[in-house]
Amino acid sequence: MANNKSSKKRVQIAERNRLENKSYKSAMRTLMKRCFSACSHYSQQPGETAKANVKASIDSAFSKIDKAVKRGVLHRNTAAHQKSRLSAAVKQAIEPAPST
């Protein structure tokens, strides 16, 4: 437990930052899930509106991930990994591999 005033304040600040980071990560994960679900919806029912939905969802997810790195919530390599997963899912949905 903290013994002096400055360390008590640091504990409070760390808890505040933890909660802010938690909500930011949660919002980021939600946008990623929306992107994955938009991809699966497009795979089942392709169309221009579904394709626009996929594009909009990946753009918003990428934006949130980049802002998380900028704010120090995520490490840049973790962000790159998440963006790579999203890109691969979108590519797979829009341009499926030819079956041979």
UniProtKB/Swiss-Prot annotation:
UniProt GO molecular function: small ribosomal subunit rRNA binding; structural constituent of ribosome
Cited function: Binds directly to 16S ribosomal RNA.
Region (Disordered) location: 79-100
GO biological process: translation
Record keywords: Ribonucleoprotein, Ribosomal protein, RNA-binding, rRNA-binding
InterPro entries in the record: Ribosomal_bS20, Ribosomal_bS20_sf
Source organism superkingdom: Bacteria
HAMAP family with a match to the protein in the record: Ribosomal_bS20
Protein name as annotated: Small ribosomal subunit protein bS20
SUPFAM superfamilies on file: Ribosomal protein S20
Family from the record: Belongs to the bacterial ribosomal protein bS20 family.
PANTHER family reported for this sequence: 30S RIBOSOMAL PROTEIN S20, SMALL RIBOSOMAL SUBUNIT PROTEIN BS20C
A GO CC term attached to the entry: cytosol
UniProt source species: Prochlorococcus marinus (strain MIT 9313)
